[in-house]
Curated annotation (Swiss-Prot):
Its cofactor is Mg(2+). Residues 1-379 are annotated as: Uridylyltransferase. Modifies, by uridylylation and deuridylylation, the PII regulatory proteins (GlnB and homologs), in response to the nitrogen status of the cell that GlnD senses through the glutamine level. Under low glutamine levels, catalyzes the conversion of the PII proteins and UTP to PII-UMP and PPi, while under higher glutamine levels, GlnD hydrolyzes PII-UMP to PII and UMP (deuridylylation). Thus, controls uridylylation state and activity of the PII proteins, and plays an important role in the regulation of nitrogen assimilation and metabolism. Pfam families: ACT (PF01842), GlnD_UR_UTase (PF08335), HD (PF01966). The lineage of its organism: Bacteria, Pseudomonadati, Pseudomonadota, Alphaproteobacteria, Hyphomicrobiales. Uridylyltransferase (UTase) activity is inhibited by glutamine, while glutamine activates uridylyl-removing (UR) activity. It catalyses: [protein-PII]-L-tyrosine + UTP = [protein-PII]-uridylyl-L-tyrosine + diphosphate; [protein-PII]-uridylyl-L-tyrosine + H2O = [protein-PII]-L-tyrosine + UMP + H(+). One of its GO terms (molecular function) is [protein-PII] uridylyltransferase activity. This is Bifunctional uridylyltransferase/uridylyl-removing enzyme.
Length: 934
């Protein structure tokens, strides 16, 4: 790449800048080191730096060249440092008759030494001395560094002679790596050349296995810190898996082992093909473009591609929306595909190291696995062998001879519990074009694939290798469409393909009994559906396969399942079940989290959808796997409790155990049961208490909770307290219950929810009851924060105290909320289309108002307050948060207990709620269902 291609003269004109500084020095009255002169020189250099960076950014926006931009910024820094060092040694601290010790070379090391920089990159410098430091040398180093620091640069530096460099490189792998990237800048070039020769002879030679082992271990540790998967939706572009540092590691290893200076030399050595070199350069260029744009956009060394900057970076790179995918999602898919390419390059280079050269280097094989080189056949035709506990190909042409071997490789690896030899994976990657329609329809290939997918061992591991190699997306093109696809929201932590693989991992863990404490019901049910277990694995692989399309992904996915299942070898009946599961895979989560499970209509409607116990069992396990695989912290005990409740209540309907007694009869039974539990109360007091709650309370609240509430209200009355709260942690459900007894008034729930928000409580559910003597008994469930019940109870009691203070007027709610109403920075990056639905068919007694919008602190308080202002009574509220999006359902009646049936009134309610949610013009709605899970 020539200077002409880089257009370096547009970044900075070195001679013009040098001439300008010389003229300043020649005409100035003060010495070059005087404060006034220093200020003038510093400002001149700052101006050149700012101008060069601005020009580099403009050129990046025009030509899009990431590598070009990195080289331009590096050239800018080289020029400024060269001129600065020249002036330090000739103007500030000149030597007329320098001794041998009064000499040095200025060397770029680390990332700067590699010849590429982003705007905020560190500038790593080595001041290389021939002997010990001298007073002259100290002055030059100090002058250079202070000028660079005053220019606002982050400079890492060391001052060493050659002996010190060699000694430290021998002891410290980080220093060794930095010197591997060393690049001469200015000063004594012979001194630098001496360091290069000694580094090669005394450090590199004979230490290849040691260095490569250290770099691979360092890479693995870095991945663990940044996130094991390359498909985290907020990746670290520099340090994350599949990022820049992985490319650097590959080049360090090859440079150290093959003694090359450029990537192009790897093609001549046969390490990379021309196509793979092109892939390397494209990946490097894209990652540089992303990183340079990030630094320019944020004006800092931002390395994490977080949600709040993804839109701007996507726009800078020129991405546009396509049907089913917005411009950010298209950009991020490209990013993750590049990260995958980096993984492919890692396997290719490791294979070349091991097979072409490593066997001749003593100790090298220890890097990759064991000392043994013993091979054994794995198949009758001898196509596959086991070598060092890894599966390998016996001949380079086995995939071309029989493309089914591309699937058989993974099948044998699963059956024998083997890792994959890098040579086999390299050959596989280079043979992907062999996967065509004939192979996809091949019965043997599909039989092998289904056995891999439903393996009783560790199907996720093998499927992950199939995905990383590109085989899975080629064998199932619909799956290939969602590889590396991200969803631009805060709820989903992984790309779609990564989520599907993690779903399969969760199911395998449940089947092996590894999650029975966390998921007792799923753990039990999996043992009762042995005949249908295969259907669950197939469903989990396919349930999100239609993401990124304009239509509902559940419906489109069901069509894909109907087409693929027969190909996999499923019967028509099994295909029908998988198709139904894919179509309904969000239903159970949505009903459990956003509907009133104490409302009989909810259960009956859900049972009508499910129809059979077999489907109910499969859907429950599917839902658990789906939610749990969304990301860390998404699953919690409260969601588990809701799903179990829905399962057990639906089971009663499907098995004929659901009571058809009239509402009045069930009310009578419940009052009699409570009376029996309060038999030690005086009859007059007991009868008076039983007259307090209305029918809905007795039909909704469990008997144990009714007893607890009775004692709670009795104690409050005896103490003469009109306002009181009670806290009860529920460890397994991961929620804490706060019960509030207070005089009833229309905005009571709004005040309670606002006080909860002000106290930091995250409400997940609320039930509202009134008594015949004008009091309210409200039960609020908040997310658990502490592991121990004692800590959680104390925290909940603090929340309760805030509620009491607000309700009693001791605290001013608006002031408290104002301190917490700043939305999270990441959430500001998203737009959630506000939606309001008013439904009179979901409940026999209540109108259900469902709202969807961008979450913000205090939103629930605002919503409940507005609903009260609209003269509506809230019977229950169900709060579900999906990252930045909230879906709240309110079961309401008018003030005389009737549903809201008047169309004009419904329209007014919608308009007011949409305005509160922030809808444009306050009037947009749509009829789609909320996406309740991944």
């Amino acid at each position: 790449m020539s200077a002409h291609d880089l257009k370096l003269e547009e970044i900075v004109n070195a001679e013009t800048l040098r001439r300008k500084l010389n003229e300043l020095a020649d005409t100035a009255d003060e010495s070059y080191t005087s404060l006034p002169m220093r200020k003038v020189v510093l400002q001149t250099l700052k101006d050149a730096l700012a101008s060069g960076r601005a020009n580099a950014e403009d050129m990046l926006m025009k030509d899009g060249g990431g590598t070009l931009c990195a080289k331009r910024l590096c050239y800018l820094m080289d020029t400024l440092i060269d001129i600065l060092f020249e002036f330090a040694t000739t103007r500030a601290y000149p030597t007329r008759n320098p001794s041998k010790a009064e000499n040095m070379a200025l060397v770029a090391v680390g990332g700067y030494g590699r010849g590429g920089l982003a705007q905020g990159s560190d500038i790593d410098l080595l001041f290389l001395l021939p002997y010990k430091q001298t007073p002259w040398g100290e002055q030059v180093v100090e002058h250079t560094l202070y000028m660079l620091w005053d220019m606002g640069l982050k400079v890492g530096h060391s001052t060493r002679n050659i002996d010190e460099c060699i000694r430290l490189a021998r002891e410290d792998m980080t220093i060794r790596t930095a010197l591997l990237d060393a690049r001469f800048l200015t000063g004594d070039k012979d001194l630098f050349r001496t360091l290069e020769i000694r580094f090669e002879e005394e450090i590199v030679k004979g230490t290849e296995p040691e260095f490569i082992q250290a770099k691979l271990a360092e890479r693995d540790a870095r991945h663990r810190k940044a996130g094991e998967t390359r498909y985290l939706v907020e990746p670290n572009v520099k340090e994350g898996k599949g990022g820049q540092r992985d490319l650097h590691t590959l080049f360090w290893i090859t440079k150290y082992f093959y003694r090359v200076k450029t990537k192009e030399e790897l093609v001549k050595l046969g390490v990379l093909s021309r196509a793979e070199l092109k892939l390397f350069n494209k990946a490097e260029d894209f990652l540089w473009a992303v990183r340079c744009h990030m630094h320019f956009a944020t004006l800092k060394a931002e390395e994490r591609l977080s949600f709040d900057i993804q839109p701007e970076i996507a726009q800078r790179l020129g991405y546009t929306a396509h049907p089913g995918q917005n411009y950010v999602e298209r950009f991020m898919k490209h990013y993750f595909l590049v990260a995958k390419d980096v993984g492919d390059l890692t396997r290719i280079i490791c294979a070349a190291l091991e097979e072409q050269q490593a066997k001749h280097v003593p100790g090298f094989n220890r890097i990759f696995l064991t000392f043994s080189r013993r091979k054994r056949k794995l198949s009758d035709d001898g196509a596959f062998i086991s070598e060092n506990h890894r599966i390998n190909i016996a001949r380079p042409d086995i995939f071309r001879q029989d493309p089914v071997n591309m699937i058989r490789l993974f099948h044998l690896a699963d059956r024998h519990g083997l890792e994959f030899h890098p040579e086999a994976m390299q050959s596989l990657t280079r043979s992907l074009k062999l996967i065509n329609a004939d192979l996809r329809e091949n019965p043997e290939a599909n039989r092998l694939f289904l056995e891999i997918l439903t393996s009783p061992r560790n199907p996720e591991l093998i499927l992950r290798r199939m995905n990383e190699s590109g085989v899975l997306g080629k064998f199932i093109p619909d799956f290939g469409k969602i590889v590396a696809m991200m969803q631009f929201n805060m709820y989903h932590h992984y790309t779609v393909d990564e989520h599907l693989l993690r779903c399969i991992a969760v199911l395998s863990e449940i089947e092996h009994g590894e999650l029975k404490t966390e998921h007792p019901l799923s753990n039990h049910l999996i043992t009762t559906i042995k005949r249908d277990r295969n259907l669950l694995y197939v469903t989990l692989l396919l349930h999100d396969i239609a993401k990124g399309r304009p239509e509902d992904h559940s419906i489109a996915g069901a069509r894909i399942a109907r087409r693929l299942c027969p190909r996999f070898g499923l019967t028509p009946s099994e295909t029908e079940t998988v198709e139904w599961l894919v179509r309904e895979h969000l239903t159970m989560s949505m009903v459990a989290q956003s509907r009133d499970l104490n409302d009989r209509k909810t259960i009956i409607d859900f049972a009508d959808t499910v129809q059979t116990m077999e489907r109910l069992k499969l859907l429950l396990i599917l839902t658990v796997c789906d939610i749990k695989a969304v990301g860390p912290g998404i699953w919690n005990g409260w969601k588990g409790q809701l799903l179990r409740t829905l399962f057990y209540e639906t089971e009663l309907v499907l098995t004929g155990g659901f009571s058809e007694l009239s509402r009045a009869a069930r009310d009578k039974q419940a009052r009699e049961a409570l009376a029996e539990r309060l038999s030690d109360w005086p009859k007059e007091e007991r009868d008076a208490y039983l007259a307090l709650p209305y029918t809905n309370y007795f039909l909704t609240v469990s008997l144990d909770d009714q007893v607890r509430h009775a004692h709670f209200i009795r104690d409050a009355d005896q103490q003469g307290r009109a306002l009181v709260t009670m806290a009860k942690p529920h460890a397994f459900e991961a929620v804490t219950e706060i019960t509030v007894l207070a005089p009833d008034h229309p905005r009571l729930l709004s005040v309670i929810t606002g006080a909860c928000a002000a106290a930091g409580g995250n409400i997940v559910d609320a039930q509202i009851f009134t008594t015949s003597d004008g009091r309210a008994l409200d039960t609020i469930l908040i997310s658990r924060e502490f592991d121990t019940d004692d800590d959680e109870r104390r925290r909940a009691e603090r929340v309760g105290k805030v509620i009491e203070d607000v309700l009693s007027g001791k605290a001013h709610l608006p002031d408290m909320l104002a301190k917490r109403t700043k939305p999270k920075k990441a959430a500001r990056a998203f737009k959630v289309e506000p939606r309001v639905e008013i439904n009179n068919t979901l409940s026999n007694k209540f109108t259900v108002i469902e709202v969807e919008g961008l979450d913000r602190p205090g939103l629930l308080s605002e919503l409940t307050g507005l609903i009260s202002d609209l003269s509506l009574d809230i019977a229950s509220a169900h709060i579900t948060t999906f990252g930045e999006k909230v879906i709240d359902s309110f079961y309401v009646t008018d003030l005389v207990g009737h549903k809201i049936s008047n169309a004009t009134r419904q329209g007014n309610i919608k308009r007011k709620l949409l305005a509160l949610l922030g809808a444009e013009n306050g009037a947009r709605t749509n009829g789609r269902s909320p996406q309740a899970a991944a």
